[in-house]
Design a protein with these regions (language model features):
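Conserved core of the PLP fold type I
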Residues: 1-110, 121-144
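Walker B catalytic acidic pair
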Residues: 118
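Amphipathic alpha-helix from the class-I
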Residues: 175-177, 195-217, 234
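Active-site PLP attachment segment
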Residues: 122-123, 132-180, 189-192
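Conserved glycine-rich beta-strand-loop-beta hairpin in the small C-terminal domain of fold type I
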Residues: 212-226, 238-247
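Hydrophobic "anchor" residues on beta-strands that sit immediately upstream
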Residues: 79, 113-114, 150
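General small-molecule cofactor/ligand-binding pocket signal
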Residues: 51-53, 150, 239
């Protein structure tokens, strides 16, 4: 999915978003970056010379007062990076209110987009304690902003890092815009790899069951760290840590 995100930024730079001015022809392009966050996201925007604005993260997601201030008043702000579920490094997930506030924004830039990296959509550690995040595409559509989000996902942290299946979900208008590039960029994707994944998983239930096996390996490691932190540092008021339900 990192490739898809890179392509999306690159396409916006060279050809613009749905008929808007290509970013490379603008004097300034800015991006909101919730911190702490994913370094590979920030590497992409840094590589293209995009000015990055730090947005503090809270337990419910990015500081929405700041996000709304920048998005609604500054037309040079073209996007925001988001990892809505089990966000690194805290493991926090976006609250319902945060998702709704994002979906209801009225950006100053007509080509503003939410870059929604759903990297850990089914990466739960527990069966009985799982975070659930509102469906951003549905919320944007309800708010009258169907084109405002690109939703990315992949099997990189399910099957093969860097060699899985990536996907982008977005509005019909955005998809039509993206396909203009894709039909030039490639004849077709790796259908053998796609078939391999389908035959292995069969359906979403197969994927969920597979992720339970990952959780059985990871859970003891998470719990070991939590137990040591509690035992050695608990009550000393010299540090804080989170206890994520997945990631």
């Amino acid at each position: 999915s990192l490739n898809v995100m890179y392509d999306t930024i690159s396409r916006s730079m060279t050809h613009g978003v749905m008929g808007n001015t290509p970013w490379c022809k603008l004097d300034k392009v800015k991006f909101l970056c919730p911190v702490p966050g994913y370094d590979r996201h920030f590497s992409i925007t840094e590589y293209f010379g995009i000015e990055m604005i730090n947005i503090p993260m809270t337990a419910d997601g990015p500081d929405m007062d700041l996000v709304e201030k920048y998005v609604t008043t500054d037309p040079t702000v073209k996007g925001i990076w988001c990892v809505p579920k089990y966000s690194n490094p805290t493991g926090n997930s976006y609250s319902d209110q945060t998702v709704r506030r994002l979906a209801r924004m009225h950006p100053a830039a007509p080509d503003f987009r939410i870059y929604w990296d759903n990297a850990y959509g089914i990466h739960h550690l527990y069966d009985d304690e799982q975070d659930h995040v509102l469906e951003i595409l549905a919320e944007c559509k309800k708010a009258g902003n169907p084109d405002m989000v690109y939703k990315f996902s992949s099997t990189s942290k399910i099957t093969f890092p860097g060699s899985g299946i990536a996907a982008i979900a977005t509005s019909h208008n955005n998809l039509d815009d993206i396909k203009k590039q894709l039909k030039i960029q490639t004849i077709g994707h790796d259908k053998v790899n796609q078939l391999r994944h389908v035959r292995f998983f069969k359906d979403i239930h197969g994927m969920v069951e597979h992720m339970r096996k990952h959780a059985n390996i990871l859970r003891p490691k998470f719990e070991a760290v939590e137990n040591i932190l509690d035992r050695e540092l608990g009550g000393l008021e010299i540090g804080t840590w989170t206890k994520p339900h997945g990631g």
